[in-house]
Protein backbone atom coordinates (compact mmCIF):
# COMPACT_ATOMS: atom_id res chain seq x y z
CA UNK A 1 0.00 0.00 0.00
CA UNK A 2 1.26 3.48 -0.85
CA UNK A 3 0.47 6.85 0.71
CA UNK A 4 0.13 9.58 -1.91
CA UNK A 5 -1.33 13.03 -2.29
CA UNK A 6 -2.76 12.34 -5.76
CA UNK A 7 -3.65 9.16 -7.61
CA UNK A 8 -4.45 8.55 -11.26
CA UNK A 9 -6.97 5.80 -10.56
CA UNK A 10 -9.16 4.94 -7.60
CA UNK A 11 -9.76 1.40 -6.30
CA UNK A 12 -11.72 -1.02 -8.52
CA UNK A 13 -15.05 -0.46 -6.77
CA UNK A 14 -14.97 3.12 -8.14
CA UNK A 15 -14.86 1.57 -11.61
CA UNK A 16 -17.87 -0.59 -10.75
CA UNK A 17 -19.66 2.52 -9.55
CA UNK A 18 -18.94 4.22 -12.89
CA UNK A 19 -20.65 1.39 -14.77
CA UNK A 20 -23.68 1.33 -12.46
CA UNK A 21 -24.03 5.12 -12.63
CA UNK A 22 -23.73 5.11 -16.42
CA UNK A 23 -26.66 2.73 -16.86
CA UNK A 24 -30.41 2.83 -16.25
CA UNK A 25 -32.24 0.32 -14.08
CA UNK A 26 -29.04 -0.95 -12.43
CA UNK A 27 -28.32 -0.60 -8.71
CA UNK A 28 -25.06 -1.28 -6.88
CA UNK A 29 -24.97 -2.45 -3.26
CA UNK A 30 -21.49 -1.76 -1.91
CA UNK A 31 -20.33 -3.33 1.33
CA UNK A 32 -18.18 -0.51 2.68
CA UNK A 33 -17.48 1.54 5.82
CA UNK A 34 -18.75 5.07 6.17
CA UNK A 35 -15.48 6.59 4.97
CA UNK A 36 -15.80 5.03 1.50
CA UNK A 37 -18.92 7.01 0.60
CA UNK A 38 -16.78 9.89 -0.71
CA UNK A 39 -17.18 8.54 -4.26
CA UNK A 40 -20.55 10.27 -4.67
CA UNK A 41 -18.68 13.55 -5.07
CA UNK A 42 -16.92 12.29 -8.19
CA UNK A 43 -20.23 12.19 -10.05
CA UNK A 44 -22.02 15.19 -8.56
CA UNK A 45 -19.02 17.54 -8.47
CA UNK A 46 -16.72 16.45 -11.33
CA UNK A 47 -19.24 14.95 -13.76
CA UNK A 48 -21.88 17.46 -12.59
CA UNK A 49 -24.74 14.98 -12.75
CA UNK A 50 -28.16 16.01 -11.52
CA UNK A 51 -28.64 12.91 -9.38
CA UNK A 52 -26.67 10.74 -6.98
CA UNK A 53 -25.11 7.52 -8.24
CA UNK A 54 -27.40 4.45 -7.82
CA UNK A 55 -25.35 3.03 -4.96
CA UNK A 56 -26.40 1.76 -1.53
CA UNK A 57 -23.63 1.57 1.07
CA UNK A 58 -23.79 -0.78 4.04
CA UNK A 59 -21.74 1.84 5.96
CA UNK A 60 -20.67 -0.48 8.76
CA UNK A 61 -18.82 1.01 11.72
CA UNK A 62 -16.24 -0.32 14.14
CA UNK A 63 -18.86 -1.41 16.65
CA UNK A 64 -20.55 -3.55 13.96
CA UNK A 65 -17.48 -5.72 13.56
CA UNK A 66 -18.21 -7.44 16.86
CA UNK A 67 -21.58 -8.65 15.57
CA UNK A 68 -22.98 -10.32 12.47
CA UNK A 69 -22.02 -8.04 9.56
CA UNK A 70 -23.56 -10.55 7.12
CA UNK A 71 -27.02 -9.70 8.42
CA UNK A 72 -26.18 -6.02 7.99
CA UNK A 73 -25.38 -6.70 4.32
CA UNK A 74 -28.59 -8.65 3.73
CA UNK A 75 -30.64 -5.90 5.35
CA UNK A 76 -29.24 -3.25 3.02
CA UNK A 77 -29.74 -5.48 -0.03
CA UNK A 78 -33.36 -5.99 0.97
CA UNK A 79 -33.89 -2.25 1.45
CA UNK A 80 -32.24 -1.40 -1.89
CA UNK A 81 -34.38 -3.85 -3.85
CA UNK A 82 -37.61 -2.77 -2.15
CA UNK A 83 -36.91 0.95 -2.56
CA UNK A 84 -35.27 1.23 -6.00
CA UNK A 85 -36.75 -1.86 -7.71
CA UNK A 86 -33.75 -2.36 -10.03
CA UNK A 87 -33.82 -4.48 -13.18
CA UNK A 88 -30.36 -5.81 -12.31
CA UNK A 89 -28.39 -5.72 -9.05
CA UNK A 90 -24.62 -5.42 -8.70
CA UNK A 91 -23.17 -6.49 -5.35
CA UNK A 92 -19.58 -5.93 -4.28
CA UNK A 93 -17.28 -4.70 -1.55
CA UNK A 94 -14.78 -1.90 -1.09
CA UNK A 95 -11.10 -2.34 -0.28
CA UNK A 96 -11.79 -2.10 3.46
CA UNK A 97 -14.72 -4.52 3.45
CA UNK A 98 -12.69 -7.03 1.44
CA UNK A 99 -10.70 -7.75 4.60
CA UNK A 100 -13.85 -8.90 6.45
CA UNK A 101 -14.66 -11.54 3.79
CA UNK A 102 -18.44 -11.41 4.16
CA UNK A 103 -18.88 -12.36 0.46
CA UNK A 104 -21.88 -10.08 -0.11
CA UNK A 105 -22.44 -11.41 -3.64
CA UNK A 106 -23.09 -14.93 -2.38
CA UNK A 107 -25.37 -13.56 0.33
CA UNK A 108 -27.42 -11.66 -2.27
CA UNK A 109 -27.80 -14.67 -4.55
CA UNK A 110 -29.09 -16.72 -1.64
CA UNK A 111 -31.93 -14.29 -0.88
CA UNK A 112 -34.21 -15.63 -3.62
CA UNK A 113 -34.70 -12.55 -5.79
CA UNK A 114 -35.81 -13.09 -9.40
CA UNK A 115 -33.84 -10.16 -10.82
CA UNK A 116 -30.33 -10.81 -12.20
CA UNK A 117 -27.74 -10.47 -9.43
CA UNK A 118 -24.14 -9.92 -10.52
CA UNK A 119 -21.56 -10.71 -7.86
CA UNK A 120 -18.41 -8.62 -8.28
CA UNK A 121 -15.07 -9.86 -7.00
CA UNK A 122 -12.70 -6.97 -7.50
CA UNK A 123 -9.25 -7.42 -5.89
CA UNK A 124 -8.76 -3.98 -4.38
CA UNK A 125 -5.10 -4.40 -3.48
CA UNK A 126 -3.85 -5.51 -6.89
CA UNK A 127 -6.16 -3.82 -9.43
CA UNK A 128 -7.32 -0.28 -10.15
CA UNK A 129 -10.36 1.71 -11.28
CA UNK A 130 -10.29 1.08 -15.05
CA UNK A 131 -9.83 -2.64 -14.52
CA UNK A 132 -12.75 -2.59 -12.09
CA UNK A 133 -14.94 -0.83 -14.65
CA UNK A 134 -13.95 -3.30 -17.38
CA UNK A 135 -14.55 -6.32 -15.15
CA UNK A 136 -17.93 -5.00 -14.00
CA UNK A 137 -19.10 -4.37 -17.55
CA UNK A 138 -17.82 -7.79 -18.62
CA UNK A 139 -19.55 -9.63 -15.75
CA UNK A 140 -22.77 -7.69 -16.32
CA UNK A 141 -22.88 -8.56 -20.04
CA UNK A 142 -22.02 -12.21 -19.33
CA UNK A 143 -24.62 -12.45 -16.60
CA UNK A 144 -27.42 -10.94 -18.69
CA UNK A 145 -26.57 -12.96 -21.83
CA UNK A 146 -25.98 -16.32 -20.15
CA UNK A 147 -29.28 -17.72 -21.50
CA UNK A 148 -28.81 -16.37 -25.04
CA UNK A 149 -28.03 -19.02 -27.69
CA UNK A 150 -24.40 -19.02 -28.81
CA UNK A 151 -23.96 -18.55 -32.55
CA UNK A 152 -20.25 -18.05 -33.18
CA UNK A 153 -20.12 -20.16 -36.37
CA UNK A 154 -23.43 -18.89 -37.76
CA UNK A 155 -22.90 -15.14 -37.37
CA UNK A 156 -22.27 -13.25 -40.59
CA UNK A 157 -21.50 -9.50 -40.33
CA UNK A 158 -22.87 -9.06 -43.87
CA UNK A 159 -26.28 -10.65 -43.22
CA UNK A 160 -27.88 -7.18 -43.31
CA UNK A 161 -27.66 -7.39 -47.10
CA UNK A 162 -29.91 -10.46 -47.31
CA UNK A 163 -32.30 -9.12 -44.66
CA UNK A 164 -32.93 -5.92 -46.59
CA UNK A 165 -31.88 -3.49 -43.86
CA UNK A 166 -29.03 -1.15 -42.96
CA UNK A 167 -26.09 -2.57 -41.01
CA UNK A 168 -26.14 -1.98 -37.25
CA UNK A 169 -23.39 -1.87 -34.67
CA UNK A 170 -22.92 -1.49 -30.91
CA UNK A 171 -20.86 1.33 -29.41
CA UNK A 172 -19.14 -0.17 -26.37
CA UNK A 173 -17.03 1.49 -23.69
CA UNK A 174 -18.32 5.04 -23.00
CA UNK A 175 -19.03 5.67 -19.33
CA UNK A 176 -19.37 8.44 -16.78
CA UNK A 177 -16.08 9.97 -15.62
CA UNK A 178 -14.59 9.07 -18.98
CA UNK A 179 -12.92 11.83 -20.99
CA UNK A 180 -15.57 13.54 -23.20
CA UNK A 181 -17.46 10.23 -23.64
CA UNK A 182 -20.86 11.89 -23.97
CA UNK A 183 -19.77 14.02 -26.92
CA UNK A 184 -17.68 11.23 -28.48
CA UNK A 185 -20.79 9.05 -28.72
CA UNK A 186 -22.72 11.80 -30.51
CA UNK A 187 -19.88 12.42 -32.96
CA UNK A 188 -19.39 8.73 -33.81
CA UNK A 189 -23.15 8.27 -34.22
CA UNK A 190 -23.20 11.22 -36.63
CA UNK A 191 -20.33 9.82 -38.71
CA UNK A 192 -21.80 6.31 -38.88
CA UNK A 193 -25.24 7.64 -39.83
CA UNK A 194 -23.59 9.59 -42.67
CA UNK A 195 -22.23 6.27 -43.97
CA UNK A 196 -25.52 4.40 -43.64
CA UNK A 197 -24.76 2.50 -40.42
CA UNK A 198 -27.31 2.32 -37.60
CA UNK A 199 -26.62 2.07 -33.86
CA UNK A 200 -28.06 -0.96 -32.08
CA UNK A 201 -26.91 -0.33 -28.48
CA UNK A 202 -24.64 2.19 -26.74
CA UNK A 203 -23.30 0.68 -23.52
CA UNK A 204 -22.72 1.14 -20.69
CA UNK A 205 -23.54 4.86 -21.03
CA UNK A 206 -27.32 5.25 -21.12
CA UNK A 207 -28.07 1.53 -21.51
CA UNK A 208 -30.60 -0.51 -19.52
CA UNK A 209 -30.39 -4.28 -18.81
CA UNK A 210 -32.95 -4.82 -21.60
CA UNK A 211 -30.53 -3.13 -24.03
CA UNK A 212 -27.70 -5.41 -22.95
CA UNK A 213 -29.88 -8.47 -23.63
CA UNK A 214 -30.30 -7.41 -27.28
CA UNK A 215 -26.63 -6.54 -27.73
CA UNK A 216 -26.11 -9.64 -29.89
CA UNK A 217 -28.56 -8.33 -32.49
CA UNK A 218 -25.80 -6.14 -33.94
CA UNK A 219 -23.66 -7.10 -36.92
CA UNK A 220 -20.43 -5.89 -35.31
CA UNK A 221 -19.12 -4.10 -32.23
CA UNK A 222 -17.19 -0.83 -32.05
CA UNK A 223 -14.76 -0.74 -29.14
CA UNK A 224 -14.48 2.98 -28.38
CA UNK A 225 -12.51 2.68 -25.13
CA UNK A 226 -10.39 -0.51 -24.84
CA UNK A 227 -9.73 0.08 -21.12
CA UNK A 228 -13.45 -0.47 -20.48
CA UNK A 229 -14.80 -2.58 -23.33
CA UNK A 230 -12.04 -4.70 -24.87
CA UNK A 231 -12.55 -7.74 -22.62
CA UNK A 232 -16.30 -7.63 -23.31
CA UNK A 233 -15.72 -7.33 -27.07
CA UNK A 234 -13.38 -10.33 -27.02
CA UNK A 235 -16.00 -12.39 -25.14
CA UNK A 236 -18.76 -11.37 -27.57
CA UNK A 237 -16.56 -12.31 -30.52
CA UNK A 238 -15.69 -15.68 -29.00
CA UNK A 239 -19.26 -16.58 -28.03
CA UNK A 240 -21.42 -14.85 -30.65
CA UNK A 241 -19.00 -14.34 -33.52
CA UNK A 242 -19.26 -10.55 -33.46
CA UNK A 243 -16.14 -8.91 -34.91
CA UNK A 244 -15.03 -5.65 -33.32
CA UNK A 245 -12.96 -2.65 -34.39
CA UNK A 246 -9.41 -2.13 -33.13
CA UNK A 247 -8.95 1.46 -34.36
CA UNK A 248 -9.96 4.37 -32.11
CA UNK A 249 -11.23 7.30 -34.24
CA UNK A 250 -9.25 10.10 -32.58
CA UNK A 251 -7.52 12.30 -35.15
CA UNK A 252 -7.98 12.66 -38.91
CA UNK A 253 -5.83 9.68 -39.91
CA UNK A 254 -7.32 7.38 -37.27
CA UNK A 255 -10.87 8.39 -38.22
CA UNK A 256 -10.20 7.47 -41.85
CA UNK A 257 -8.67 4.15 -40.75
CA UNK A 258 -11.65 3.52 -38.47
CA UNK A 259 -14.13 4.08 -41.31
CA UNK A 260 -12.19 1.72 -43.58
CA UNK A 261 -12.11 -0.93 -40.85
CA UNK A 262 -15.83 -0.83 -40.04
CA UNK A 263 -16.73 -0.87 -43.76
CA UNK A 264 -14.54 -3.95 -44.25
CA UNK A 265 -16.05 -5.73 -41.23
CA UNK A 266 -19.58 -5.12 -42.51
CA UNK A 267 -18.80 -5.97 -46.13
CA UNK A 268 -19.53 -2.42 -47.33
CA UNK A 269 -17.85 -0.53 -50.14
CA UNK A 270 -14.90 1.44 -48.79
CA UNK A 271 -15.55 5.20 -48.41
CA UNK A 272 -13.74 7.75 -50.56
CA UNK A 273 -10.87 9.60 -48.93
CA UNK A 274 -12.66 12.93 -49.41
CA UNK A 275 -11.89 13.85 -45.83
CA UNK A 276 -8.20 14.28 -46.60
CA UNK A 277 -8.87 17.56 -48.43
CA UNK A 278 -10.21 19.13 -45.25
CA UNK A 279 -13.88 19.04 -46.20
CA UNK A 280 -14.73 17.26 -42.94
CA UNK A 281 -12.07 18.48 -40.47
CA UNK A 282 -10.09 21.71 -40.43
CA UNK A 283 -7.13 20.18 -38.58
CA UNK A 284 -5.38 19.06 -41.77
CA UNK A 285 -5.37 22.51 -43.40
CA UNK A 286 -4.86 24.47 -40.18
CA UNK A 287 -1.78 22.42 -39.33
CA UNK A 288 -0.34 23.28 -42.79
CA UNK A 289 -1.32 26.94 -42.79
CA UNK A 290 1.20 29.78 -42.55
CA UNK A 291 0.04 30.77 -39.06
CA UNK A 292 0.78 27.28 -37.79
CA UNK A 293 4.20 26.79 -39.37
CA UNK A 294 5.98 27.81 -36.19
CA UNK A 295 4.42 24.78 -34.46
CA UNK A 296 6.49 22.32 -36.49
CA UNK A 297 9.12 20.54 -34.44
CA UNK A 298 7.80 21.66 -31.06
CA UNK A 299 8.79 19.23 -28.29
CA UNK A 300 5.80 17.56 -26.63
CA UNK A 301 5.49 15.25 -23.60
CA UNK A 302 2.42 12.94 -23.49
CA UNK A 303 1.02 11.08 -20.47
CA UNK A 304 -2.43 9.73 -19.59
CA UNK A 305 -4.65 6.70 -20.13
CA UNK A 306 -3.61 4.27 -22.85
CA UNK A 307 -6.33 5.09 -25.38
CA UNK A 308 -5.75 8.84 -25.44
CA UNK A 309 -1.96 8.61 -25.18
CA UNK A 310 -1.71 6.35 -28.24
CA UNK A 311 -4.03 8.62 -30.20
CA UNK A 312 -2.21 11.77 -29.07
CA UNK A 313 1.20 10.41 -30.07
CA UNK A 314 -0.05 9.67 -33.59
CA UNK A 315 -1.68 13.09 -33.98
CA UNK A 316 1.33 14.94 -32.55
CA UNK A 317 3.88 13.08 -34.67
CA UNK A 318 2.04 12.57 -37.97
CA UNK A 319 -0.59 15.30 -38.17
CA UNK A 320 0.83 18.33 -36.36
CA UNK A 321 4.55 17.80 -36.90
CA UNK A 322 5.48 17.86 -33.20
CA UNK A 323 8.50 16.04 -31.83
CA UNK A 324 7.37 13.59 -29.14
CA UNK A 325 10.05 13.62 -26.41
CA UNK A 326 8.17 11.67 -23.75
CA UNK A 327 5.38 9.07 -23.78
CA UNK A 328 3.80 7.19 -20.91
CA UNK A 329 0.69 5.89 -19.22
CA UNK A 330 -0.65 4.93 -15.81
CA UNK A 331 -2.80 2.16 -17.38
CA UNK A 332 -0.81 -1.02 -16.84
CA UNK A 333 -3.37 -2.93 -18.92
CA UNK A 334 -2.30 -0.81 -21.92
CA UNK A 335 1.42 -0.76 -21.09
CA UNK A 336 2.49 -3.09 -23.90
CA UNK A 337 0.80 -1.00 -26.61
CA UNK A 338 2.26 2.22 -25.22
CA UNK A 339 5.74 0.66 -25.06
CA UNK A 340 5.45 -0.38 -28.71
CA UNK A 341 4.35 3.13 -29.71
CA UNK A 342 7.23 4.68 -27.75
CA UNK A 343 9.71 2.29 -29.36
CA UNK A 344 8.59 3.43 -32.83
CA UNK A 345 9.40 7.00 -31.78
CA UNK A 346 12.79 6.02 -30.38
CA UNK A 347 11.66 6.52 -26.77
CA UNK A 348 11.37 4.46 -23.62
CA UNK A 349 7.80 4.51 -22.31
CA UNK A 350 7.12 5.75 -18.79
CA UNK A 351 4.73 3.31 -17.07
CA UNK A 352 3.93 4.60 -13.59
CA UNK A 353 1.16 5.78 -11.29
CA UNK A 354 3.50 8.16 -9.42
CA UNK A 355 2.78 11.74 -10.47
CA UNK A 356 6.12 12.89 -9.02
CA UNK A 357 7.98 10.50 -11.34
CA UNK A 358 6.02 11.97 -14.25
CA UNK A 359 6.93 15.51 -13.17
CA UNK A 360 10.59 14.55 -12.98
CA UNK A 361 10.40 13.04 -16.48
CA UNK A 362 8.87 16.28 -17.76
CA UNK A 363 11.77 18.24 -16.26
CA UNK A 364 14.34 15.94 -17.85
CA UNK A 365 12.78 16.01 -21.33
CA UNK A 366 12.27 19.83 -21.29
CA UNK A 367 9.20 19.88 -23.57
CA UNK A 368 7.50 22.95 -24.99
CA UNK A 369 4.02 21.46 -24.49
CA UNK A 370 2.65 18.88 -22.05
CA UNK A 371 -0.38 16.73 -22.95
CA UNK A 372 -1.59 14.94 -19.85
CA UNK A 373 -4.08 14.71 -17.03
CA UNK A 374 -5.15 17.18 -14.38
CA UNK A 375 -1.99 16.26 -12.44
CA UNK A 376 0.28 17.14 -15.36
CA UNK A 377 -1.55 20.46 -15.63
CA UNK A 378 -0.37 21.27 -12.08
CA UNK A 379 3.15 20.00 -12.77
CA UNK A 380 3.41 21.98 -16.00
CA UNK A 381 2.17 25.12 -14.25
CA UNK A 382 4.93 24.78 -11.65
CA UNK A 383 7.49 24.34 -14.43
CA UNK A 384 6.11 27.19 -16.55
CA UNK A 385 5.23 24.93 -19.52
CA UNK A 386 1.98 25.12 -21.55
CA UNK A 387 -0.34 22.16 -20.99
CA UNK A 388 -3.53 20.66 -22.42
CA UNK A 389 -5.56 17.95 -20.67
CA UNK A 390 -6.20 14.92 -22.91
CA UNK A 391 -7.18 12.23 -20.41
CA UNK A 392 -8.73 11.43 -17.06
CA UNK A 393 -8.26 12.11 -14.19
CA UNK A 394 -9.70 15.51 -14.97
CA UNK A 395 -10.98 18.66 -13.33
CA UNK A 396 -14.52 20.00 -13.51
CA UNK A 397 -13.33 22.48 -16.16
CA UNK A 398 -12.62 19.51 -18.44
CA UNK A 399 -16.33 18.61 -18.48
CA UNK A 400 -17.53 21.52 -20.62
CA UNK A 401 -21.17 22.40 -21.18
CA UNK A 402 -20.48 22.88 -24.90
CA UNK A 403 -20.15 20.13 -27.51
CA UNK A 404 -16.49 19.17 -27.31
CA UNK A 405 -15.70 15.62 -28.55
CA UNK A 406 -12.27 14.07 -29.05
CA UNK A 407 -13.33 11.53 -31.68
CA UNK A 408 -14.21 12.01 -35.33
CA UNK A 409 -13.88 15.08 -37.53
CA UNK A 410 -15.16 17.59 -35.00
CA UNK A 411 -12.96 15.96 -32.37
CA UNK A 412 -9.93 16.69 -34.56
CA UNK A 413 -10.95 20.35 -34.67
CA UNK A 414 -11.34 20.44 -30.88
CA UNK A 415 -7.95 18.78 -30.40
CA UNK A 416 -6.22 21.32 -32.67
CA UNK A 417 -7.66 24.22 -30.69
CA UNK A 418 -6.98 22.65 -27.29
CA UNK A 419 -3.36 21.83 -28.12
CA UNK A 420 -2.36 24.89 -30.13
CA UNK A 421 -3.91 27.65 -28.02
CA UNK A 422 -1.66 26.96 -24.98
CA UNK A 423 1.37 27.24 -27.28
CA UNK A 424 0.18 30.57 -28.65
CA UNK A 425 -0.44 31.90 -25.17
CA UNK A 426 2.97 30.67 -24.10
CA UNK A 427 4.61 32.46 -27.02
CA UNK A 428 2.82 35.69 -26.14
CA UNK A 429 4.01 35.45 -22.54
CA UNK A 430 7.57 34.85 -23.68
CA UNK A 431 7.54 37.81 -26.06
CA UNK A 432 6.14 40.08 -23.36
CA UNK A 433 8.87 38.86 -21.04
CA UNK A 434 11.61 39.46 -23.61
CA UNK A 435 10.49 42.99 -24.47
CA UNK A 436 9.20 44.07 -21.08
CA UNK A 437 11.92 46.74 -20.84
CA UNK A 438 10.82 48.42 -24.10
CA UNK A 439 8.87 51.67 -23.86
CA UNK A 440 5.57 50.01 -24.83
CA UNK A 441 5.65 47.98 -21.63
CA UNK A 442 6.84 50.71 -19.26
CA UNK A 443 4.10 52.17 -17.09
CA UNK A 444 5.60 55.66 -17.14
CA UNK A 445 5.20 56.00 -20.91
CA UNK A 446 2.03 57.00 -22.69
CA UNK A 447 -0.10 54.10 -23.85
CA UNK A 448 -1.71 53.64 -27.26
CA UNK A 449 -4.84 55.09 -25.63
CA UNK A 450 -3.30 58.56 -25.78
CA UNK A 451 -6.32 60.46 -24.51
CA UNK A 452 -6.23 58.46 -21.26
CA UNK A 453 -2.56 59.04 -20.58
CA UNK A 454 -0.09 56.72 -18.94
CA UNK A 455 0.42 55.63 -15.39
CA UNK A 456 2.67 57.85 -13.31
CA UNK A 457 5.07 55.64 -11.45
CA UNK A 458 8.76 55.61 -10.68
CA UNK A 459 8.94 51.86 -10.34
CA UNK A 460 9.73 49.64 -13.29
CA UNK A 461 7.06 47.14 -14.23
CA UNK A 462 7.60 43.95 -12.32
CA UNK A 463 8.33 40.93 -14.49
CA UNK A 464 6.06 37.90 -14.34
CA UNK A 465 6.95 35.52 -11.55
CA UNK A 466 8.20 32.81 -13.86
CA UNK A 467 10.95 35.16 -15.11
CA UNK A 468 12.29 35.69 -11.62
CA UNK A 469 13.60 32.21 -11.03
CA UNK A 470 16.28 32.24 -8.34
CA UNK A 471 18.59 29.54 -7.14
CA UNK A 472 16.92 27.93 -4.13
CA UNK A 473 18.62 28.62 -0.82
CA UNK A 474 18.39 24.93 0.00
CA UNK A 475 20.86 24.02 -2.76
CA UNK A 476 24.27 22.63 -1.75
CA UNK A 477 27.04 25.16 -1.15
CA UNK A 478 29.10 23.93 -4.11
CA UNK A 479 26.42 25.14 -6.53
CA UNK A 480 27.56 28.28 -8.39
CA UNK A 481 25.83 31.58 -7.69
CA UNK A 482 23.92 33.44 -10.41
CA UNK A 483 24.76 37.12 -10.71
CA UNK A 484 22.03 39.66 -11.58
CA UNK A 485 23.56 39.89 -15.07
CA UNK A 486 23.35 36.11 -15.45
CA UNK A 487 19.74 36.04 -14.27
CA UNK A 488 18.91 38.81 -16.74
CA UNK A 489 20.43 36.86 -19.64
CA UNK A 490 18.67 33.67 -18.51
CA UNK A 491 15.33 35.50 -18.51
CA UNK A 492 15.74 36.17 -22.24
CA UNK A 493 15.69 32.45 -22.98
CA UNK A 494 12.25 30.94 -23.77
CA UNK A 495 10.61 29.67 -20.60
CA UNK A 496 10.01 26.19 -21.98
CA UNK A 497 13.77 25.48 -22.25
CA UNK A 498 14.98 27.81 -19.49
CA UNK A 499 15.12 25.05 -16.90
CA UNK A 500 17.32 22.90 -19.12
CA UNK A 501 19.62 25.83 -19.92
CA UNK A 502 19.95 26.67 -16.21
CA UNK A 503 20.87 23.08 -15.39
CA UNK A 504 23.41 22.78 -18.22
CA UNK A 505 25.00 26.12 -17.34
CA UNK A 506 25.40 25.14 -13.69
CA UNK A 507 26.90 21.81 -14.79
CA UNK A 508 29.38 23.64 -17.04
CA UNK A 509 30.27 26.11 -14.28
CA UNK A 510 31.00 23.24 -11.89
CA UNK A 511 33.22 21.58 -14.49
CA UNK A 512 35.39 24.67 -14.95
CA UNK A 513 35.33 25.62 -11.25
CA UNK A 514 33.38 28.84 -11.74
CA UNK A 515 31.69 30.16 -8.58
CA UNK A 516 29.61 32.91 -10.19
CA UNK A 517 27.56 32.67 -13.38
CA UNK A 518 27.29 35.87 -15.39
CA UNK A 519 26.12 36.51 -18.94
CA UNK A 520 29.46 35.49 -20.44
CA UNK A 521 29.46 32.18 -18.57
CA UNK A 522 25.99 31.48 -19.90
CA UNK A 523 27.13 32.07 -23.48
CA UNK A 524 30.25 29.91 -22.95
CA UNK A 525 28.07 27.09 -21.62
CA UNK A 526 25.79 27.36 -24.64
CA UNK A 527 28.77 27.13 -26.98
CA UNK A 528 30.16 24.18 -25.02
CA UNK A 529 27.00 22.07 -25.22
CA UNK A 530 26.31 22.99 -28.86
CA UNK A 531 29.82 22.04 -29.93
UniProtKB/Swiss-Prot annotation:
One of its GO terms (molecular function) is 4 iron, 4 sulfur cluster binding. The keyword Metal-binding applies. [4Fe-4S] cluster binds at residue 36. Substrate binds at residues 426-427. Keywords: 4Fe-4S, ATP-binding, Chlorophyll biosynthesis, Iron, Iron-sulfur, Metal-binding, Nucleotide-binding, Oxidoreductase, Photosynthesis. GO terms for biological process: light-independent chlorophyll biosynthetic process; photosynthesis, dark reaction. Pfam families: Oxidored_nitro, PCP_red. The keyword Nucleotide-binding applies. Binds 1 [4Fe-4S] cluster per heterodimer. The cluster is bound at the heterodimer interface by residues from both subunits. The active site is at residue 291. Its EC number is 1.3.7.7. It comes from the Bacteria. It catalyses: chlorophyllide a + oxidized 2[4Fe-4S]-[ferredoxin] + 2 ADP + 2 phosphate = protochlorophyllide a + reduced 2[4Fe-4S]-[ferredoxin] + 2 ATP + 2 H2O. Belongs to the ChlB/BchB/BchZ family. Protochlorophyllide reductase is composed of three subunits; ChlL, ChlN and ChlB. Forms a heterotetramer of two ChlB and two ChlN subunits. Component of the dark-operative protochlorophyllide reductase (DPOR) that uses Mg-ATP and reduced ferredoxin to reduce ring D of protochlorophyllide (Pchlide) to form chlorophyllide a (Chlide). This reaction is light-independent. The NB-protein (ChlN-ChlB) is the catalytic component of the complex. PANTHER family: LIGHT-INDEPENDENT PROTOCHLOROPHYLLIDE REDUCTASE SUBUNIT B. This is Light-independent protochlorophyllide reductase subunit B. It comes from Prochlorococcus marinus (strain MIT 9211). The lineage of its organism: Bacteria, Bacillati, Cyanobacteriota, Cyanophyceae, Synechococcales. The gene is chlB.
